[in-house]
Every structure is written in structure tokens, then in C-alpha cells.
Amino acid sequence: MKKGTVLNSEISSVISRLGHTDTLVVCDAGLPIPNSAARIDMALTQGVPSFMQVVDVVTREMQVEAAILATEIKQQNPQLHETLLTHLEQLQQYQGNTIKISYTTHEQFKKLTADSQAVIRSGECSPYANVILCAGVTF
């Protein structure tokens, strides 16, 4: 049995295949997932697992260089926005690198997901609970 933090075989596999600047999306239950991206559906019911639970587990195993958020999260979901920023700050310290955070419109965000290696759907049912994680290198 795998001893690492990610037991889900699809998530573990996609993270292990990421190259520098490849992207991985963690999204809420409502984000449309393009056919061009692999869909990893973790949603069991509303709120399970939460967006932050999925982000936490994924970022324990993935080296993150940048994160892209929809601008709308600032106004429409400020509490989750702050929680995510705090998590990314702590991740920077753990990884020993700076994580660039950028924002785009929700419409543009949805277009960017088409280029991701995979989209991991959480059970989160709060607005704009989505992030595009850009892979860094460990050296």
C-alpha cells in the first residue's frame, strides 16, 4: 500500500506526471469541466470533500510554483479566499519558494482549465472555490 499522503490512484498518477509549468485544477462542484481535461471526480455530496481538504492533500504532494484564481472570489467568497491565501503562504514556507498568485475573470478561468492536465472536482458548494495550480520543480 502507498505510504504517501495521496491514496487516490488517479490524483497520485497525475501529480507524478506533472512537468514544470503543467497545471492541475481543484474546483467546486459546479465548475464546468472541459472534455479536453481529465476529470477526477471526488464529490460525494454537498461539501464532501471540501475544496480546502482537496487542496491541502494535493499540495502536500505537488510542488507549486503559481496559483490562478478567479477575481470574483475576493468579493463573492472572501472567507475561502483568505483561507486559500493563508494555505499558499504556509506552502511557500514549507517548499522554500515564492508562489506567484494571479487573478483572472471567471470566464477566462474556465477557458484556462481546458489546458490543464486534470480537473479535480470537490464537493464544495460555495462560489468561485476554484484554483489552477501550476507545477514547479523541486530542484
UniProtKB/Swiss-Prot annotation:
Gene3D superfamilies according to UniProt: RbsD-like domain (3.40.1650.10)
Pathway(s) it belongs to: Carbohydrate metabolism; D-ribose degradation; D-ribose 5-phosphate from beta-D-ribopyranose: step 1/2
Location, primary (coarse class): cytoplasm
Catalysis: reaction(s): beta-D-ribopyranose = beta-D-ribofuranose
Stretches that traverse the bilayer: none
Alphabetized Pfam families for the sequence: RbsD_FucU
A GO term from the CC aspect: cytosol
Keywords: Carbohydrate metabolism, Cytoplasm, Isomerase
Entry superkingdom: Bacteria
Active site: 20 (proton donor)
InterPro entries from the UniProt entry: D-ribose_pyranase (IPR023064), RbsD-like_sf (IPR023750), RbsD_FucU (IPR007721)
Binding site for substrate: 28, 106, 128-130
GO molecular function: D-ribose pyranase activity; intramolecular lyase activity; monosaccharide binding
Compartments where found: Cytoplasm
Record-listed E.C. numbers: 5.4.99.62
Biological process according to GO: D-ribose catabolic process
Function: Catalyzes the interconversion of beta-pyran and beta-furan forms of D-ribose.
Family (UniProt): Belongs to the RbsD / FucU family. RbsD subfamily.
Subunit (UniProt): Homodecamer.
Database matches in NCBIfam families: PRK11797.1
Descriptive protein name: D-ribose pyranase
Organism ancestry: Bacteria, Pseudomonadati, Pseudomonadota, Gammaproteobacteria, Enterobacterales
Gene: rbsD
